[in-house]
Amino acid sequence: MDRRIFGLETEFGVTCAFEGQRKLSPDEVARYLFRKVVSWGRSSNVFLKNGARLYLDVGSHPEYATPECDDVRQLVVHDRAGERTLEGLLTDAERRLEEEGIAGEVFLFKNNTDSAGNSYGCHENYLVSRHGEFGKLSDVLIPFLVSRQLIVGAGKVVQTPRGAVYSLSQRADHIWEGVSSATTRSRPIINTRDEPHADAERYRRLHVIVGDSNMSETTTMLKLGATDLVLRMVEEGVVLREMTMENPIRAIREISHDMTGRKPVRLANGREASALEIQEEYLEKAKEFVESRGLQTPTIKRVLDLWERALRAVATQDFSLVDREVDWVIKKKLLDRYMAKHDLPLTSPRIARLDLAYHDIHRKRGLHYMLAERGMAERVCSDIEVFEALSVPPQTTRAKLRGDFVRAAQEKRRDFTVDWVHLKLNDQAQRTVLCKDPFKAVDDRVERLIDSM
């Protein structure tokens, strides 16, 4: 698929630090966060002017689903805009708490595990054609997804009975199946619940739930860009080596705990291969594919370059090659320096706090933002682009129709209902437009509906 629709859904961790007597549960904190949203949207599940969806997910986790994007870089911008949207809710919630005499700070974390061991996710969505074999797609994709934490993991200090270890991925220890239709109960690598949010005869939505939430823009770009290239190769029938794993769930945990990338993983055909070898195989094929198809866009060039350097960094253990571009490496460098400076072990509670602070989405507190400010974490997009994406939908996908409709209805104070495919005015006529084509950014029916307000 030359042009693909992408989207990211990110659940955020919520916590609160209170100074007074009154303590609030995460549920209560979440209600404070969403009070402003509920006051104008009459619900804690709303679509915004930029085409995105904002809602309160199970277990009081705020979730932001980006609008449909047809470009990896554009999606990185909209993913950042989601962080800014939630930062706005956070500031508003703190102000309300203060007005009510409750002293405390609200924290939102873009990570994947809380102190109680609960896991929440960052789900990637890729539109794929209905006509291919989904089984074949997942066969090729699973070894890639299991091993890609080597280059796109968010990193985490894990406390074990034998002491603390640094893992590549936050999510790896919480994945229980390869392919499944459930997302929470049995956390698979690929979720097969068939909800294309598009014409079901033409498309299906590949829902990848194995990935970490990334703070680094360059890591997000690599995660999406490399996965897109692997998908394109499968769609075009590129022959890839048989990499099916004997036990992908055991493999994902073993790989996460091995920073050398060299631990052998048993394959279904009896052979063994390391995460490094598996990733190198996909990278070589992707480079040949891009070369032969003439696909050298600036983003694809940047993705391939970072992919190659990240693997070289793991192979040589010289992480200075990517220590401003890959999340788990950026974070490890930060923790290592702090431990050396203060003579602390990895088990220190101060290190656990630092690990968490890396994922704080408040720009004045979050360590990733501070590093980016000092040039120690590279960017993909500018603050101006992110600011614009807060209120302007992507102009080349269905998100434009939805965003324009929401904006017009709010300005005209009209009652409306919106989801990924429907736009509805709740008037006597109950007029509804069904938008089944996610690639379509212009539609006369939507224009007429807006004009009729």
Curated annotation (Swiss-Prot):
Q: Name one GO biological process term.
A: modification-dependent protein catabolic process
Which reaction is the catalytic activity of this chain?
Answer: ATP + [prokaryotic ubiquitin-like protein]-L-glutamate + [protein]-L-lysine = ADP + phosphate + N(6)-([prokaryotic ubiquitin-like protein]-gamma-L-glutamyl)-[protein]-L-lysine
Q: Which terms are listed as keywords in the entry? A: ATP-binding, Ligase, Magnesium, Metal-binding, Nucleotide-binding, Ubl conjugation pathway
Q: In which pathway does it act?
A: Protein degradation; proteasomal Pup-dependent pathway; Protein modification; protein pupylation
Disulfide topology: none
Active-site residue numbers: D57 (proton acceptor)
Q: Which Pfam families match?
A: Pup_ligase (PF03136)
Task: Tell me which EC number(s) this protein carries.
Answer: 6.3.1.19
Name the domain of life.
Bacteria
Does the entry feature the keyword Mitochondrion, yes or no?
Answer: no
Cite the binding residues for Mg(2+): E9, Y55, E63
Q: Which amino acids does the record list as binding ATP?
A: R53, T66, W420
The protein's GO terms of the molecular function aspect are:
ATP binding; ligase activity, forming carbon-nitrogen bonds; magnesium ion binding; ubiquitin-like protein transferase activity
Q: What does this protein do?
A: Catalyzes the covalent attachment of the prokaryotic ubiquitin-like protein modifier Pup to the proteasomal substrate proteins, thereby targeting them for proteasomal degradation. This tagging system is termed pupylation. The ligation reaction involves the side-chain carboxylate of the C-terminal glutamate of Pup and the side-chain amino group of a substrate lysine.
Please give the family membership noted in the entry. Belongs to the Pup ligase/Pup deamidase family. Pup-conjugating enzyme subfamily.
Note, other: The reaction mechanism probably proceeds via the activation of Pup by phosphorylation of its C-terminal glutamate, which is then subject to nucleophilic attack by the substrate lysine, resulting in an isopeptide bond and the release of phosphate as a good leaving group.
Q: What is this protein called?
A: Pup--protein ligase
